[in-house]
Amino acid sequence: MPHPSLKSNRALPLLTFARTHSFAIPAICVYNLEGILAIIRAAEHKRSPAMILLFPWAIQYADSLLVRTAASACRAASVPITLHLDHAQDPEIIKRAADLSRSETHEPGFDSIMVDMSHFSKEENLRLTRELVAYCNARGIATEAEPGRIEGGEDGVQDTVDLEGVLTTPEESEEFVATGINWLAPAFGNVHGNYGPRGVQLDYERLQRINEAVGERVGLVLHGADPFTKEIFEKCIERGVAKVNVNRAVNNEYVKVMREKAGSLPITRLHEEVTNAMQAAVEKIMDMIDSTGKAEFMMDEK
Protein backbone atom coordinates (compact mmCIF):
# COMPACT_ATOMS: atom_id res chain seq x y z
CA MET A 1 0.00 0.00 0.00
CA PRO A 2 1.53 3.38 -1.01
CA HIS A 3 2.46 5.89 1.68
CA PRO A 4 -0.45 8.30 2.43
CA SER A 5 1.60 11.22 1.11
CA LEU A 6 1.78 9.51 -2.30
CA LYS A 7 -1.96 9.72 -3.02
CA SER A 8 -1.47 12.59 -5.45
CA ASN A 9 1.84 11.38 -6.87
CA ARG A 10 1.86 11.79 -10.65
CA ALA A 11 4.26 8.96 -11.50
CA LEU A 12 2.72 5.96 -9.73
CA PRO A 13 -0.35 5.72 -12.00
CA LEU A 14 1.87 5.50 -15.08
CA LEU A 15 3.50 2.20 -14.12
CA THR A 16 0.27 0.78 -12.73
CA PHE A 17 -1.51 1.50 -16.01
CA ALA A 18 1.39 0.15 -18.08
CA ARG A 19 1.51 -3.11 -16.15
CA THR A 20 -2.23 -3.72 -16.43
CA HIS A 21 -2.22 -2.89 -20.16
CA SER A 22 0.92 -4.86 -21.15
CA PHE A 23 3.27 -2.11 -22.26
CA ALA A 24 6.09 -0.12 -20.68
CA ILE A 25 6.68 3.53 -19.88
CA PRO A 26 9.62 5.01 -21.83
CA ALA A 27 11.96 6.60 -19.29
CA ILE A 28 14.60 8.58 -21.14
CA CYS A 29 17.80 9.91 -19.56
CA VAL A 30 18.76 13.38 -20.79
CA TYR A 31 21.33 16.01 -19.92
CA ASN A 32 20.14 19.23 -21.56
CA LEU A 33 17.22 21.26 -22.89
CA GLU A 34 17.39 19.52 -26.27
CA GLY A 35 16.77 16.19 -24.57
CA ILE A 36 13.86 17.56 -22.55
CA LEU A 37 12.26 19.01 -25.69
CA ALA A 38 12.84 15.78 -27.62
CA ILE A 39 10.95 13.72 -25.04
CA ILE A 40 8.05 16.16 -24.73
CA ARG A 41 7.66 16.45 -28.50
CA ALA A 42 7.97 12.70 -29.05
CA ALA A 43 5.40 11.93 -26.36
CA GLU A 44 2.94 14.47 -27.73
CA HIS A 45 3.44 13.29 -31.31
CA LYS A 46 3.10 9.61 -30.42
CA ARG A 47 0.44 10.26 -27.74
CA SER A 48 2.56 8.27 -25.33
CA PRO A 49 3.08 8.62 -21.58
CA ALA A 50 6.74 9.15 -20.70
CA MET A 51 9.28 9.96 -18.02
CA ILE A 52 12.13 12.43 -18.24
CA LEU A 53 15.15 11.15 -16.31
CA LEU A 54 17.86 13.42 -14.94
CA PHE A 55 20.99 12.29 -13.15
CA PRO A 56 22.26 13.95 -9.94
CA TRP A 57 24.81 15.65 -12.17
CA ALA A 58 22.01 17.96 -13.34
CA ILE A 59 21.67 19.31 -9.78
CA GLN A 60 25.42 19.55 -9.24
CA TYR A 61 25.87 21.31 -12.58
CA ALA A 62 22.90 23.69 -12.65
CA ASP A 63 21.38 23.61 -9.16
CA SER A 64 17.60 23.56 -9.65
CA LEU A 65 17.54 25.15 -13.12
CA LEU A 66 17.28 21.98 -15.25
CA VAL A 67 15.02 20.35 -12.67
CA ARG A 68 12.53 23.23 -12.67
CA THR A 69 12.64 23.46 -16.47
CA ALA A 70 11.98 19.75 -16.93
CA ALA A 71 9.29 19.63 -14.24
CA SER A 72 7.46 22.59 -15.73
CA ALA A 73 7.65 21.05 -19.21
CA CYS A 74 6.20 17.79 -17.88
CA ARG A 75 3.23 19.56 -16.33
CA ALA A 76 2.57 21.67 -19.41
CA ALA A 77 2.51 18.66 -21.77
CA SER A 78 -0.73 17.42 -23.30
CA VAL A 79 0.08 13.82 -22.30
CA PRO A 80 1.14 12.32 -18.94
CA ILE A 81 4.88 12.94 -18.44
CA THR A 82 6.72 12.86 -15.13
CA LEU A 83 10.20 13.74 -13.87
CA HIS A 84 12.49 11.15 -12.28
CA LEU A 85 15.93 11.45 -10.65
CA ASP A 86 17.88 8.41 -11.81
CA HIS A 87 20.71 6.65 -9.95
CA ALA A 88 20.90 9.02 -7.01
CA GLN A 89 23.82 7.50 -5.11
CA ASP A 90 24.55 10.18 -2.50
CA PRO A 91 22.11 10.42 0.44
CA GLU A 92 22.61 14.17 0.68
CA ILE A 93 21.80 14.68 -3.01
CA ILE A 94 18.66 12.58 -2.57
CA LYS A 95 17.48 14.74 0.31
CA ARG A 96 18.33 17.90 -1.59
CA ALA A 97 16.39 16.66 -4.63
CA ALA A 98 13.43 15.63 -2.50
CA ASP A 99 13.33 19.04 -0.85
CA LEU A 100 13.08 20.68 -4.29
CA SER A 101 9.68 19.05 -4.62
CA ARG A 102 8.10 20.14 -1.35
CA SER A 103 4.56 21.33 -1.90
CA GLU A 104 4.93 24.44 0.26
CA THR A 105 7.35 25.94 -2.30
CA HIS A 106 4.60 25.73 -4.96
CA GLU A 107 7.31 24.89 -7.49
CA PRO A 108 7.39 21.56 -9.34
CA GLY A 109 10.24 19.14 -8.81
CA PHE A 110 10.82 15.40 -9.02
CA ASP A 111 7.88 13.02 -9.05
CA SER A 112 10.13 10.04 -8.30
CA ILE A 113 13.70 9.29 -7.25
CA MET A 114 15.86 6.21 -7.67
CA VAL A 115 17.52 5.56 -4.32
CA ASP A 116 20.59 3.73 -5.63
CA MET A 117 22.66 2.46 -2.73
CA SER A 118 23.86 -0.58 -4.73
CA HIS A 119 27.51 0.45 -4.32
CA PHE A 120 27.21 -0.30 -0.57
CA SER A 121 27.08 -3.71 1.09
CA LYS A 122 23.68 -5.37 1.01
CA GLU A 123 22.97 -4.58 4.67
CA GLU A 124 23.95 -0.93 4.29
CA ASN A 125 22.05 -0.74 1.01
CA LEU A 126 18.86 -1.89 2.74
CA ARG A 127 19.34 0.40 5.75
CA LEU A 128 20.00 3.52 3.68
CA THR A 129 17.26 2.68 1.20
CA ARG A 130 14.67 2.36 3.98
CA GLU A 131 15.75 5.67 5.52
CA LEU A 132 15.76 7.57 2.22
CA VAL A 133 12.51 6.05 0.98
CA ALA A 134 10.80 7.37 4.11
CA TYR A 135 12.33 10.81 3.51
CA CYS A 136 11.07 10.88 -0.09
CA ASN A 137 7.65 9.45 0.71
CA ALA A 138 7.04 12.13 3.34
CA ARG A 139 7.45 14.67 0.54
CA GLY A 140 5.12 12.87 -1.86
CA ILE A 141 7.87 11.37 -4.00
CA ALA A 142 7.78 7.79 -5.30
CA THR A 143 10.94 5.69 -5.08
CA GLU A 144 12.88 3.04 -6.97
CA ALA A 145 15.77 0.84 -5.84
CA GLU A 146 18.24 -1.61 -7.36
CA PRO A 147 19.07 -4.87 -5.54
CA GLY A 148 22.38 -6.33 -6.66
CA ARG A 149 24.60 -4.57 -9.12
CA ILE A 150 23.79 -3.99 -12.77
CA GLU A 151 27.40 -3.82 -13.92
CA GLY A 152 28.84 -1.49 -16.47
CA GLY A 153 29.49 2.20 -17.01
CA GLU A 154 26.95 4.88 -17.88
CA ASP A 155 27.31 8.65 -17.99
CA GLY A 156 26.19 9.94 -14.62
CA VAL A 157 26.39 6.59 -12.78
CA GLN A 158 29.17 5.47 -10.45
CA ASP A 159 31.07 2.70 -12.26
CA THR A 160 30.62 -0.72 -10.64
CA VAL A 161 32.44 -2.69 -13.32
CA ASP A 162 35.17 -3.80 -10.90
CA LEU A 163 32.68 -5.03 -8.31
CA GLU A 164 31.50 -8.61 -8.24
CA GLY A 165 28.31 -8.86 -10.26
CA VAL A 166 25.25 -9.88 -8.27
CA LEU A 167 22.00 -11.00 -9.86
CA THR A 168 18.78 -10.29 -8.00
CA THR A 169 16.92 -13.14 -6.33
CA PRO A 170 13.23 -13.27 -5.37
CA GLU A 171 14.32 -13.30 -1.73
CA GLU A 172 16.34 -10.09 -2.15
CA SER A 173 13.40 -8.55 -3.96
CA GLU A 174 11.22 -9.21 -0.92
CA GLU A 175 13.79 -7.53 1.32
CA PHE A 176 13.80 -4.41 -0.84
CA VAL A 177 10.03 -4.27 -1.12
CA ALA A 178 10.00 -4.23 2.69
CA THR A 179 11.91 -0.91 2.62
CA GLY A 180 8.80 0.75 1.18
CA ILE A 181 9.96 1.27 -2.41
CA ASN A 182 7.41 1.58 -5.20
CA TRP A 183 9.54 0.24 -8.05
CA LEU A 184 12.26 -2.39 -8.26
CA ALA A 185 15.07 -2.53 -10.84
CA PRO A 186 16.25 -6.17 -10.80
CA ALA A 187 19.58 -7.39 -12.15
CA PHE A 188 18.95 -10.39 -14.40
CA GLY A 189 21.78 -10.10 -16.91
CA ASN A 190 21.11 -6.51 -17.97
CA VAL A 191 24.00 -4.06 -17.71
CA HIS A 192 24.62 -0.32 -17.91
CA GLY A 193 26.74 0.58 -20.90
CA ASN A 194 28.22 -1.91 -23.35
CA TYR A 195 27.29 -5.60 -23.32
CA GLY A 196 30.60 -6.84 -24.72
CA PRO A 197 31.31 -9.54 -27.33
CA ARG A 198 28.73 -12.02 -25.99
CA GLY A 199 25.92 -9.55 -26.49
CA VAL A 200 22.70 -9.49 -24.48
CA GLN A 201 22.31 -12.52 -22.18
CA LEU A 202 19.18 -12.11 -20.07
CA ASP A 203 17.88 -14.58 -17.49
CA TYR A 204 14.18 -14.41 -18.28
CA GLU A 205 13.36 -17.19 -15.84
CA ARG A 206 14.89 -15.15 -13.02
CA LEU A 207 12.85 -12.11 -14.05
CA GLN A 208 9.70 -14.25 -14.09
CA ARG A 209 10.38 -15.54 -10.56
CA ILE A 210 10.94 -12.00 -9.31
CA ASN A 211 7.71 -10.88 -10.94
CA GLU A 212 5.79 -13.74 -9.36
CA ALA A 213 7.26 -12.87 -5.95
CA VAL A 214 6.77 -9.09 -5.86
CA GLY A 215 5.22 -7.89 -9.12
CA GLU A 216 1.80 -7.30 -7.61
CA ARG A 217 3.28 -4.93 -5.02
CA VAL A 218 5.93 -2.97 -6.93
CA GLY A 219 6.53 -1.94 -10.52
CA LEU A 220 9.47 -3.63 -12.25
CA VAL A 221 11.99 -1.44 -14.06
CA LEU A 222 14.37 -2.43 -16.84
CA HIS A 223 17.80 -0.78 -16.87
CA GLY A 224 20.50 -1.19 -19.50
CA ALA A 225 18.03 -1.45 -22.37
CA ASP A 226 19.80 0.63 -25.02
CA PRO A 227 20.70 -2.18 -27.48
CA PHE A 228 17.52 -4.22 -27.00
CA THR A 229 15.25 -5.33 -29.83
CA LYS A 230 11.46 -5.24 -29.87
CA GLU A 231 11.44 -8.99 -29.22
CA ILE A 232 13.55 -8.58 -26.07
CA PHE A 233 11.32 -5.78 -24.84
CA GLU A 234 8.23 -7.92 -25.39
CA LYS A 235 9.71 -10.78 -23.35
CA CYS A 236 10.55 -8.41 -20.50
CA ILE A 237 7.10 -6.79 -20.55
CA GLU A 238 5.47 -10.24 -20.51
CA ARG A 239 7.40 -10.86 -17.29
CA GLY A 240 6.23 -7.72 -15.52
CA VAL A 241 8.47 -4.87 -16.67
CA ALA A 242 6.48 -1.62 -16.72
CA LYS A 243 9.24 1.01 -17.10
CA VAL A 244 12.16 0.93 -19.53
CA ASN A 245 15.17 3.19 -18.96
CA VAL A 246 17.03 4.33 -22.08
CA ASN A 247 20.11 6.50 -22.33
CA ARG A 248 22.64 6.04 -25.12
CA ALA A 249 20.13 5.07 -27.80
CA VAL A 250 18.86 8.65 -27.57
CA ASN A 251 21.88 10.66 -26.44
CA ASN A 252 24.18 9.12 -29.05
CA GLU A 253 22.05 10.97 -31.61
CA TYR A 254 23.03 14.25 -29.95
CA VAL A 255 26.72 13.36 -30.21
CA LYS A 256 26.36 12.13 -33.80
CA VAL A 257 24.71 15.31 -35.09
CA MET A 258 27.16 17.53 -33.21
CA ARG A 259 30.16 15.66 -34.64
CA GLU A 260 28.81 15.73 -38.18
CA LYS A 261 27.39 19.25 -38.36
CA ALA A 262 28.97 21.50 -35.72
CA GLY A 263 30.67 24.38 -37.51
CA SER A 264 28.74 23.88 -40.74
CA LEU A 265 25.34 25.11 -39.51
CA PRO A 266 24.17 28.18 -37.59
CA ILE A 267 23.94 27.35 -33.89
CA THR A 268 20.15 27.72 -33.88
CA ARG A 269 19.78 25.26 -36.77
CA LEU A 270 22.25 22.88 -35.12
CA HIS A 271 20.19 22.75 -31.92
CA GLU A 272 17.03 22.14 -33.94
CA GLU A 273 18.62 19.24 -35.82
CA VAL A 274 19.95 17.73 -32.60
CA THR A 275 16.49 17.91 -31.01
CA ASN A 276 14.85 16.38 -34.09
CA ALA A 277 17.31 13.48 -34.16
CA MET A 278 16.79 12.78 -30.46
CA GLN A 279 13.01 13.00 -30.87
CA ALA A 280 13.11 10.40 -33.66
CA ALA A 281 15.10 8.06 -31.41
CA VAL A 282 12.60 8.48 -28.56
CA GLU A 283 9.69 7.80 -30.90
CA LYS A 284 11.36 4.59 -32.06
CA ILE A 285 11.60 3.42 -28.43
CA MET A 286 7.93 4.25 -27.86
CA ASP A 287 6.95 2.06 -30.80
CA MET A 288 9.18 -0.79 -29.60
CA ILE A 289 7.72 -0.90 -26.09
CA ASP A 290 4.16 -0.31 -27.31
CA SER A 291 3.52 2.93 -25.42
CA THR A 292 2.47 4.74 -28.60
CA GLY A 293 -1.16 5.82 -28.38
CA LYS A 294 -1.57 4.78 -24.75
CA ALA A 295 -1.81 8.33 -23.35
CA GLU A 296 -5.36 8.75 -24.61
CA PHE A 297 -6.48 5.59 -22.82
CA MET A 298 -4.77 6.73 -19.60
CA MET A 299 -6.48 10.10 -19.68
CA ASP A 300 -9.85 8.52 -20.52
CA GLU A 301 -9.63 6.34 -17.39
CA LYS A 302 -8.97 9.28 -15.04
Swiss-Prot record:
Catalytic EC class: lyase
Protein name (database record): Putative fructose-bisphosphate aldolase
Catalytic residues, chain numbering: 86
Native source organism of the sequence: Coccidioides immitis (strain RS)
Taxonomic lineage: Eukaryota, Fungi, Dikarya, Ascomycota, Pezizomycotina
Function: Catalyzes the aldol condensation of dihydroxyacetone phosphate (DHAP or glycerone-phosphate) with glyceraldehyde 3-phosphate (G3P) to form fructose 1,6-bisphosphate (FBP) in gluconeogenesis and the reverse reaction in glycolysis.
One Gene Ontology molecular-function label: fructose-bisphosphate aldolase activity
Binding site for Zn(2+) 1: 87, 192, 223
Transmembrane as UniProt keyword: no
UniProt cofactor note: Binds 2 Zn(2+) ions per subunit. One is catalytic and the other provides a structural contribution.
EC number of this enzyme: 4.1.2.13
Superkingdom of the source species: Eukaryota
